[in-house]
């Protein structure tokens, strides 16, 4: 059963940088420029990420002079919640308004092991996957690091009401994370830091459609973050049909980058494989996929796709999903079927935002 809470849009105007975009060392540098001791950075982070205050006046252990400097330099407002949809399984989807009127989606998913959040990195997407609602309308702009951080802060504030916490996160919302690489990395470091929300690196997952140069760069980062590839096809011809990015970053080159990442980090990689009825879900596709992944330290996550009205793809029948899984397992592939959540709300990535855009143009 769906429960929806809808609020009015606000006139938001952010002329100053978001304070949520600053890493701890950047806050320390700013304080030094202001003639303030750098230990104040830890106090400020405590107010932002532990107490989660909404204004500078509540930072009672800071001098009024420092609070004024912060107010004059950084915006502390986060996001305006436009829509909050709650599913019968506890999944909550948020539609947040940004300062310039654009909207983004964030999803809270409840598991036996804790609460997971799926965050967005861009307003729209330029990748053009033919099955995805996120790319409808194209890319509007990148999110700043602080706008990605603010999604987690806002969801955590909602969980504070029931004394729960965000225990893990996936960067699989609207947009291509590696298309906004610097802001992505700033976000991850803020969220991971012990003075931030302190979500462990191994409890975070970043997914990419396959921007190869950034895969090599990501392999050199010092964060032990889980890594996933949106694959969705076992060969170049089919992948190019489903994901036009494959024409720029071809599958053989992508597999080489993935092998480099696995060898460089020693970490297992996850391949996301959405199943589209009659397109990529036959036994021969599973056999071809097993051959493609042979020798790669990996896990395959099979995704029964959500129906998107603007797209032509249909869901693979349940029996066919199990057959596809069995075919992979019989060939030694580590595979699971992703548990569906939020099926009774607009839980497919980009659906709620697309619906909101339609209502605005009526």
From Swiss-Prot:
Entry GO terms, CC: cytoplasm
Active site: 105 (proton acceptor), 349 (s-methylcysteine intermediate)
Segments passing through the bilayer: none
Gene3D superfamilies for the chain: 1.10.150.530, Aldolase class I
Family annotation (HAMAP family): RNA_methyltr_RlmN (MF_01849)
Record-listed S-adenosyl-L-methionine binding positions: 175-176, 207, 230-232, 306
Cellular location(s): Cytoplasm
Catalysis: reaction(s): adenosine(2503) in 23S rRNA + 2 reduced [2Fe-2S]-[ferredoxin] + 2 S-adenosyl-L-methionine = 2-methyladenosine(2503) in 23S rRNA + 5'-deoxyadenosine + L-methionine + 2 oxidized [2Fe-2S]-[ferredoxin] + S-adenosyl-L-homocysteine; adenosine(37) in tRNA + 2 reduced [2Fe-2S]-[ferredoxin] + 2 S-adenosyl-L-methionine = 2-methyladenosine(37) in tRNA + 5'-deoxyadenosine + L-methionine + 2 oxidized [2Fe-2S]-[ferredoxin] + S-adenosyl-L-homocysteine
Name of the protein in question: Probable dual-specificity RNA methyltransferase RlmN
Keyword terms, alphabetized: 4Fe-4S, Cytoplasm, Disulfide bond, Iron, Iron-sulfur, Metal-binding, Methyltransferase, rRNA processing, S-adenosyl-L-methionine, Transferase, tRNA processing
Family: Belongs to the radical SAM superfamily. RlmN family.
GO molecular function, one term: rRNA (adenine(2503)-C2-)-methyltransferase activity
Lineage: Bacteria, Bacillati, Bacillota, Bacilli, Bacillales
Native source organism of the sequence: Bacillus cereus (strain B4264)
CDD domains: Radical_SAM (cd01335)
Cofactor: [4Fe-4S] cluster
CC cofactor note: Binds 1 [4Fe-4S] cluster. The cluster is coordinated with 3 cysteines and an exchangeable S-adenosyl-L-methionine.
Enzyme class: transferase
């Amino acid at each position: 059963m769906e429960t929806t809470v809808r609020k009015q849009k606000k006139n938001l105007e952010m002329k100053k940088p978001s304070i949520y975009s600053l890493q701890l060392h950047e806050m320390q540098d700013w304080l030094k420029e202001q003639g303030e001791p750098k230990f104040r950075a830890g106090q400020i982070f405590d107010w932002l990420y532990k107490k989660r205050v909404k204004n500078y006046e509540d930072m009672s252990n800071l001098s009024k002079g420092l609070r004024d400097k912060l107010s004059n330099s950084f915006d502390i407002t986060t996001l305006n919640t436009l829509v909050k949809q709650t599913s019968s399984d506890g999944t909550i989807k948020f539609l947040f308004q940004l300062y310039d009127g654009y909207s983004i989606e964030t999803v809270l998913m409840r598991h036996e092991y804790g609460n997971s959040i799926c965050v967005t990195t861009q307003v729209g997407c330029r990748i053009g996957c033919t099955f995805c609602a996120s790319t409808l309308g194209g890319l509007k702009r990148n999110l700043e690091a602080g706008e990605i951080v603010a999604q987690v802060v806002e969801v955590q504030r909602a969980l504070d009401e029931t004394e729960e916490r965000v225990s893990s996160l996936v960067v699989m919302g609207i947009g291509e994370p590696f298309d906004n690489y610097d802001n992505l990395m700033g976000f991850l470091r803020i969220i991971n830091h012990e003075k931030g929300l302190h979500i462990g690196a191994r409890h975070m997952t970043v997914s990419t459609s396959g921007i190869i140069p950034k895969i090599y760069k990501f392999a050199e980062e010092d964060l032990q973050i889980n890594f996933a590839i949106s694959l969705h096809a076992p060969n170049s011809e089919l992948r190019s049909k489903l994901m036009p990015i494959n024409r720029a970053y071809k599958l053989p080159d992508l597999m080489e980058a993935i092998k480099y990442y696995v060898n460089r980090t020693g970490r297992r990689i996850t391949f996301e494989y959405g199943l589209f009825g009659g397109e990529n879900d036959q036994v021969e596709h599973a056999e071809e996929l097993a051959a493609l992944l042979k020798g790669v330290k990996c896990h395959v996550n099979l995704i029964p796709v959500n129906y998107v009205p603007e797209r032509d793809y249909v869901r693979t029948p349940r029996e066919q999903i199990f057959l596809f899984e069995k075919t992979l397992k019989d060939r030694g592939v580590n595979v699971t079927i992703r548990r569906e959540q939020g099926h009774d709300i607009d839980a497919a990535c980009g659906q709620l935002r697309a619906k909101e855009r339609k209502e605005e143009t009526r």
